[in-house]
C-alpha cells in the first residue's frame, strides 16, 4: 500500500479550493495562462494536491505555450494512468494520478522530440509545488537524487 493515499471526499472538500476540487474530482479544466504554475520554473517537484504523491520534476518541465504546466514525462510512468477521453467533441488521452484517481490533465504527442515527444499538459490546480530547498523538510528526501546531473 502506498504511503500516498487519497483523502475522503469530505476531507477534500474541506482542504481544497472549489477549483482544485472541480479539477481533480470532476475532471474540469482551469483557465489557461493565469494558473499558478504555468510560469513557474523553480527547482523542485510537483505533487498530487489530493495525496501528496510526487508526480513531476521541474527538470522535465518546458515552455509549451499551451497555457498550462507542461512536462515531458512523469517522475515514474507507473504513477500515472491514461484513459481515452472523448469529451468536448475531441479524442484525447486523459491523465490521472494512479493512486488517488485524481484528474490531472491530458497528454499529447506534440512535445519536443528531443525530450521524448510527449507533452503532459497538467492543471496547476491538481498540483502542489515543493521547492527543492524544502523537499527534505517536507518528507520528499527520497526524490532529491533525481536532481543529480541535471
Swiss-Prot record:
This is Peptide methionine sulfoxide reductase MsrB. Belongs to the MsrB Met sulfoxide reductase family. It catalyses: L-methionyl-[protein] + [thioredoxin]-disulfide + H2O = L-methionyl-(R)-S-oxide-[protein] + [thioredoxin]-dithiol. GO terms for molecular function: peptide-methionine (R)-S-oxide reductase activity. It comes from the Bacteria. It is an enzyme of class 1 (oxidoreductase). GO terms for cellular component: cytoplasm. The keyword Oxidoreductase applies. The keyword Lipoprotein does not apply. Keywords: Oxidoreductase. NCBIfam families: peptide-methionine (R)-S-oxide reductase MsrB. The active site is at 121 (nucleophile). PROSITE patterns: MSRB (PS51790). Its EC number is 1.8.4.12. Residues 9-132 form the MsrB domain. InterPro entries: Met_Sox_Rdtase_MsrB (IPR028427), Met_Sox_Rdtase_MsrB_dom (IPR002579), Mss4-like_sf (IPR011057). One of its GO terms (biological process) is protein repair. It comes from Mycoplasma genitalium (strain ATCC 33530 / DSM 19775 / NCTC 10195 / G37). It holds the Pfam family SelR. PANTHER family: METHIONINE SULFOXIDE REDUCTASE, PEPTIDE METHIONINE SULFOXIDE REDUCTASE MSRA_MSRB. SUPFAM superfamilies: Mss4-like.
Amino acid at each position: 500500500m502506498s504511503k500516498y493515499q487519497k483523502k475522503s471526499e469530505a476531507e477534500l472538500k474541506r482542504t481544497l479550493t472549489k477549483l482544485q476540487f472541480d479539477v481533480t474530482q470532476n475532471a474540469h479544466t482551469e483557465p489557461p495562462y493565469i494558473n499558478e504554475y504555468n510560469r513557474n520554473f523553480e527547482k523542485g517537484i510537483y505533487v498530487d494536491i489530493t495525496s501528496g504523491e510526487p508526480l513531476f520534476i521541474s527538470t522535465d518541465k518546458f515552455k509549451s505555450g499551451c497555457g498550462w504546466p507542461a512536462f515531458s514525462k512523469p517522475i515514474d510512468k507507473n504513477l500515472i494512468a491514461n484513459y481515452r477521453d472523448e469529451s468536448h467533441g475531441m479524442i484525447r488521452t486523459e491523465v490521472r494520478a494512479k493512486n488517488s484517481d485524481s484528474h490531472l490533465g491530458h497528454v499529447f504527442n506534440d512535445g519536443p522530440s528531443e525530450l521524448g515527444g510527449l507533452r503532459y499538459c497538467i492543471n496547476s490546480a491538481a498540483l502542489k509545488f515543493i521547492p527543492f530547498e524544502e523537499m527534505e523538510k517536507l518528507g520528499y528526501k527520497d526524490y532529491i537524487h533525481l536532481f543529480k546531473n541535471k
